[in-house]
């Protein structure tokens, strides 16, 4: 039976998870998805300490979010599979447009036709980019 667990903070948490979910218990961690690259680094440390990810036959893929320089190095080294990169330039452009509209008296969403706009909640969704090296 597959279960989901949240990787909350660091390598200590991942070490605990790896001690509870083992091959011996027939309930092994198969994939680690972290909410940021710092958590992914901690997970990678814990996995390596437990003897994982040193070879392809005993590998558990790890993913993070932010595409930090450290994560890019881990991806290049083969220790991490990928990360999600936020589009800072796209976010800044959207914020600048909305600020301009708000200060000029224009309708807030004027000029947003090229964006992915959720009309039900007046949100502009800026796409993320997958980083795998």
Indicate residue ranges for each PLM-predicted region.
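Short, solvent-exposed amphipathic alpha-helices that sit
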Residues: 1-2, 13, 17, 42-46
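Short beta-strand elements at the ligand-binding edges of bilobed clamshell
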Residues: 77-89
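Hinge/cleft segment of the Venus flytrap/periplasmic-binding protein
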Residues: 90-133
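Residue-level recognition of the N-termini of beta-strands and the immediately preceding loop/turn
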Residues: 1-2, 27-31, 58-61
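Short, small-residue-biased leader/transition segments that mark boundaries at the very start
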Residues: 3-8
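Extracellular/periplasmic ligand-binding modules, especially the Venus flytrap/periplasmic-binding
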Residues: 31, 35-44, 88-103
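Venus flytrap/periplasmic-binding-protein-like
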Residues: 34-36, 41-80
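Short, well-structured alpha-helical segments in soluble
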Residues: 12-28
């Amino acid at each position: 039976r597959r279960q989901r667990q949240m990787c909350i903070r660091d390598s200590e948490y991942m070490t605990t998870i790896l001690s509870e979910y083992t091959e011996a218990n027939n309930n092994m961690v198969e994939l680690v998805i972290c909410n940021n690259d710092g958590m992914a680094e901690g997970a990678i440390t814990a996995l390596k300490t437990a003897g994982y990810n040193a070879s392809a036959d005993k590998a558990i893929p790890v993913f993070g979010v932010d595409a930090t320089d450290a994560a890019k190095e881990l991806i290049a080294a083969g220790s991490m599979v990928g990360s999600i990169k936020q589009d800072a330039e796209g976010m800044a452009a959207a914020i600048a447009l909305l600020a301009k509209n708000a200060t000029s008296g224009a309708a807030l969403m004027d000029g947003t036709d090229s964006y992915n706009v959720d009309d039900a909640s007046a949100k502009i969704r800026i796409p993320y980019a997958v980083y795998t090296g």
